[in-house]
Amino acid sequence: MRTVLRALGACLLCILAVATGCRFGGAVGAAGIGARSGKLEVSEQAVRLLAQVARQPRLTLAMAGDCMFDRGVRAICDERGREWLLSAVRDTLRAADVAFLNLETSIARGGARLPGKGIWFRSAPEFAQELANAGVDVVTLANNHVLDYDDPAFAETLSNLAQTGIAVCGGGRNMADARRPAVLSANGISVAFLGYSEFAHIYWSAARPKRFVAGEASPGISCWDREAIIEDIRRAKRLADHVVVSF
């Protein structure tokens, strides 16, 4: 595919040169493409190349930022219904082959607030299904709110997402899980998703110095670590055609 794309780039440059030549009434010829007397002439070779490129599989990504369903958002949902919340973007998300966003909340009923944070997000489990119904395929958990209600709510979040079929990156039952890419495929093209947060090592209260970063045997999110990220990207490139990294 890369060879075809490079050839397409050369072909487009030739067409641009042709257009420039036509504009000034000149004659330009390159790689079988020429312009004479203001008339565009395309060789059979160029036509075959363009047809080959047109037959290449394509994948459409829809990507969104922070998403949560608590506080004021929850109040609106209580008034208008959960289905209303994503109605304006549902068609766009569903039309994409893969839809990705940052889940800036736990999706759970359990857990207890971590002291000292000041702002806590926890969304009802039903919203996991709302995301799936809206066409969301994969989320990153690498942020500073997914563990607001501690490990029990985080574990419940992982379970609720798994039940709806939404893939996860950037967080997991341990560091290996958190760094493992979520790989999705459509139209014969695979994409690996990775997520990281610079807030993973922060804690908000000395009374409960809970960091969000995952450990070898403890749940959490993946942190910003340049060498680890490079290693993860290299590993992901062996698993998929393309890699998407979220910070």
What are these model-derived regions, one by one?
Residues 22-247:
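Acidic, metal/ion-coordinating pockets
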